Amino acid sequence: MYNLNKLHLLLCILILSMSSLASNEEVFERANTGVVLIMGDDGFGSGALISPQGHILTNWHVVEGAENLEVALHHEYDLGDDFQEYFFEAKVIKVDSEKDLALIKIINPPKDLNVLRISQVIPPIGSQVHAIGHPNTEFWSYTTGYISQMKNQHEWSYEDGGIDHVATVYLTQTPIDEGNSGGPLLNEHGNIIGINTFGSKEASFQNYSVSAIEVIRFLAAR
């Protein structure tokens, strides 16, 4: 009887864990309002809301050198709309240029922000992942793919010659174009497992996201 009860409990846990997985549509609906548009002096990128106080995770290269930062929250709009009514001033709180991570904050955040959770679970190779961002001004666009590899202490540079960045990253098939940088890589629960960082110009299926392992360390560091 003990073993049967134990088996029944395990089956219940399995069913609950399976039912908590969201469809692609559900992941987008859960997470899209937790993704922001970040405007700097020289360009734009994506970010992920992680606190009710308006803290946002993004890439360092999205906010690098920007003296003026503004953040737009998700809204229903046409391309002809005046974006200014949706923008909030933001400031940089901390950065880690080596990991290409930044934490910024909306100075006067509105209420009821949709905060995204950061997962502490390392996703296995082959896991389906999701991304929301603003590739080439296609605002709040959704893409999906799979984790191909986890690369510890991966080195990369945005300029020819030299290595500027080192971090544990996920290699995924999820497309990352200009404007996607800084947005969240999400698991099937809609939780953050990485920050989308850059894609290969030579191969569309080689795209890289700084892992949540690095994000958690970054947030914990003083």
Which residues does each PLM region occupy?
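Cleaved targeting-peptide boundary
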Residues: 21-28
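Bacterial N-terminal signal peptides that target proteins for export
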Residues: 1-9
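Short, well-ordered amphipathic alpha-helices
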Residues: 23, 70-75, 146-151
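Active-site region of chymotrypsin-like
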Residues: 29-42, 106-115, 141-222
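Small-residue-enriched segments and motifs
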Residues: 47, 88-90, 145, 183
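N-terminal signal peptide c-region/cleavage motif recognized by signal peptidases
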Residues: 17-19
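Conserved active-site neighborhood of the chymotrypsin/trypsin-like protease fold
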Residues: 34-35, 43-44, 51-140
